[in-house]
Amino acid sequence: IAAAPTFQSASIPAIGCSCTNPAVTEANPYYFRVCFLDPFQGSVMANFAKDEFSAANAYVLSMLGEDYGSGLATYFVNAFEDLGGTVTSEQFPEGTSDFSAYIQNAINAGADVIFAPCATTYAAQIITQAASAGFDKPITAGDTWESSVILDAQKGTSVQVYCSTFFDENDD
């Protein structure tokens, strides 16, 4: 997003391979992308939660002031509510390392699923702390969770983790 005005004012074409936020290329005839957008990603993950887990209640946790996570959270919330689901949303401040209160809030809200579009550093902490709290429902997120950091955090726990991804097993 920050570089878009530079590309536009200099008439330099740019192609983003993983910039899922619609604002990145908005109103810029020189900026293109090759990936899906967050409105699609949020909707897919909301439908996945409803279809795969019969989720009626979702708990959404994103970082305050972070464009990617806040935007993706909004798209998920809108889609999940359109599907008839109920959502409890919270945001955590940058630098948070103790997510136990948020996990407890998810449990208290009767969450059938957590959707947490955030950086992998926070994701790993959310996963391990959810496991410690005994949270036994799926934790889902967007494309940033496609990382070995997530696999390492989940390893040895019973926490189910799912994320959207650009991977296509049928693509040669």
Locations of regions flagged by a protein language model:
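Beta-alpha junction/loop-to-helix N-cap segments that form part of ligand/metal-binding clefts
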Residues: 1-26, 34, 92-100, 121-124, ...
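Periplasmic-binding protein-like
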Residues: 1, 13-17, 57-62, 110-120, ...
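An alpha-beta-alpha
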Residues: 30-94, 113
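Active-site-proximal beta-strand/loop segments in catalytic clefts of secreted hydrolases
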Residues: 17-20, 35-37, 61-66, 91-95, ...
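Extracellular glycoside hydrolase catalytic/binding regions
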Residues: 10-47, 162-168
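Loop/turn elements at helix/coil->beta-strand transitions in domains of secreted/extracellular proteins
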Residues: 9-14, 27-30, 53-58, 82-88, ...
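Structural motif
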Residues: 41-44, 91-106, 172
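Extracellular/periplasmic periplasmic-binding protein-like sensory domains
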Residues: 127-172
